[in-house]
C-alpha cells in the first residue's frame, strides 16, 4: 500500500481498497479524477482528485493554441481556490445546493490531492451528457439556492471575480475578437456584471457536466469548484443554459427555465436573506440576463469563432444586451 492509499484508508477507516477506477484525466494533463472502492469503514467509495502541477514548459499543448503563461497561471491558481473552497466553504452548503464534502486534502510541492465524498453513493449517481427537462430544472434550482445562500459573502481565498471567462482574465481572446461592436461594449458589459449591487458567489463553471443527478433527475449536486468566486448569478445561469440548450427551442420554452430559476431564487432569498428585497434582486438580475450572455459570447467569439454556441439565439441576446447598455448603466450603476 503506497502513501496515497494509506492516507485514504486512514481517513475513511476502511480495511482495504478493492478497486481504483480512473473517471477522467484533468484538462491539459494536470492530473486525474479517481473513484476508489473500499472494503469496511464508513464509505463504500470515495473520489480522489489528484493534481500534479507541471512547469509551464512541460505542459501538454492546448488543442486551440491558447497556451500562454497567463492561462497556465490561471489554472494553477484555480486548484488553490478549489482547495480553499473544499476546506472553508463546502461544509456550509445544504441539501438544496449539495456539494461533496472534502474528507481530507494534502498539498506537497507541486502535487495536491483531495479526498471527496462520492456523490454516486449519496444518491446522485447520474452524470449526463444530454440533459433531460427534469435535470435542467434541477440544475437551475441548485444554482438559485447557491446564489441566495452566498449573496454578499466575501470570496476570501476564492477568486475575487469568479468564472473562467471574465474580461480581466481573457485579454488574448479580446485582442483577436472580430466583432467590433461587442469588443467596444466589453468594458461596459463587465462593469454592469461586476458593479451592480447584488453580488454573490458564482460556481464559475456551471455546465451540465459539472452536475450529478439523482436517479429521477429531480435533484442535483455540483462538483468542480476551480472558478468559484464573486459575481452576478446570471453568469452561472447563462453558462448552464449554454450547456443544455439545443438553440432550437422557442423563446417561450427558454423563458420557462428562467421563470423557474427566479421563482426558486425568490424562495431561497426569503430563506437565506430575509432582510434583502428579493423582488429587487430578481428585477435587477432579470435585466442582466442578456448582459451575462453577451459577456460569455465575447469570450467564445474570441476563443473559437466557429463554435456551435455562436448562433442566432446567442447573437440576438448579445445584440439586445448591447442596445440596452446605456439605459442599464444609468439605472443599475447610479442607484447603488
Residue ranges of each PLM-predicted region?
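Conserved short submotifs of the Hanks-type protein kinase catalytic core
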Residues: 111-122
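Active-site acidic catalytic loop and adjacent metal/ATP-binding pocket
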Residues: 32-38, 42, 47, 189-235
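All-alpha amphipathic helical-bundle segments outside canonical DNA-binding/catalytic cores
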Residues: 272-292
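ATP/Mg2+ or Mg2+-diphosphate-binding catalytic cores
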Residues: 286-336
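ATP-dependent phospho-/nucleotidyl transfer catalytic cores
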Residues: 122-203, 212-215
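Active-site activation/catalytic loop segments of kinase-like enzymes and analogous catalytic loops
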Residues: 71, 84, 230-271, 292-311
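Short, glycine/acidic-rich hinge or "gate" loops at secondary-structure transitions
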Residues: 102-106, 153-166, 272-279
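Conserved NTP-binding catalytic cores of kinases and kinase-like/nucleotidyltransferase enzymes
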Residues: 1-109, 214-220, 334-336
Amino acid at each position: 500500500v503506497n502513501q496515497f492509499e494509506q492516507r485514504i484508508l486512514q481517513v475513511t477507516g476502511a480495511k482495504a481498497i478493492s478497486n481504483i477506477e480512473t473517471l477522467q484525466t484533468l484538462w491539459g494533463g494536470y492530473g486525474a479524477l479517481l473513484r476508489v472502492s473500499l472494503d469496511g469503514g464508513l464509505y463504500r467509495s470515495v473520489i480522489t482528485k489528484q493534481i500534479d502541477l507541471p512547469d509551464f514548459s512541460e505542459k501538454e499543448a492546448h488543442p486551440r493554441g491558447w497556451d500562454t503563461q497567463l492561462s497556465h497561471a490561471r489554472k494553477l491558481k484555480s486548484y488553490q481556490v478549489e482547495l480553499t473552497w473544499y476546506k472553508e466553504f463546502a461544509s456550509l452548503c445544504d441539501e438544496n445546493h449539495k456539494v461533496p464534502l472534502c474528507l481530507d486534502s494534502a498539498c506537497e510541492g507541486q502535487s495536491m490531492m483531495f479526498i471527496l465524498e462520492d456523490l454516486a453513493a449519496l444518491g446522485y449517481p447520474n452524470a449526463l451528457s444530454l440533459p433531460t427537462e427534469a435535470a435542467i430544472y434541477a440544475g437551475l434550482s441548485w444554482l438559485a439556492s447557491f446564489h441566495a445562500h452566498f449573496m454578499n459573502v466575501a470570496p476570501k481565498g476564492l477568486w475575487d471575480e469568479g468564472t473562467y471567462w471574465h474580461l480581466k482574465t481573457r485579454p488574448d481572446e479580446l485582442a483577436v475578437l472580430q466583432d467590433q461592436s461587442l469588443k467596444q461594449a466589453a468594458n461596459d458589459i463587465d462593469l454592469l456584471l461586476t458593479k451592480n449591487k447584488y453580488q454573490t458567489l458564482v460556481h464559475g463553471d456551471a455546465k451540465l457536466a459539472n452536475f450529478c443527478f439523482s436517479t429521477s433527475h429531480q435533484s442535483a449536486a455540483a462538483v468542480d469548484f476551480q472558478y468559484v468566486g464573486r459575481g452576478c448569478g446570471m453568469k452561472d445561469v447563462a453558462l448552464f443554459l449554454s450547456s443544455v440548450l439545443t438553440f432550437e427551442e422557442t423563446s417561450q420554452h427558454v423563458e420557462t427555465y428562467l421563470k423557474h430559476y427566479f421563482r426558486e431564487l425568490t424562495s431561497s432569498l426569503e430563506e437565506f436573506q430575509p432582510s434583502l428585497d428579493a423582488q429587487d434582486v430578481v428585477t435587477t438580475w432579470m435585466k442582466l440576463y442578456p448582459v451575462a450572455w453577451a459577456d460569455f459570447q465575447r469570450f467564445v467569439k474570441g476563443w473559437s469563432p466557429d463554435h456551435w454556441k455562436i448562433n442566432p439565439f446567442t447573437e440576438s441576446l448579445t445584440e439586445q444586451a448591447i442596445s440596452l447598455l446605456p439605459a442599464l448603466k444609468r439605472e443599475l450603476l447610479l442607484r447603488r
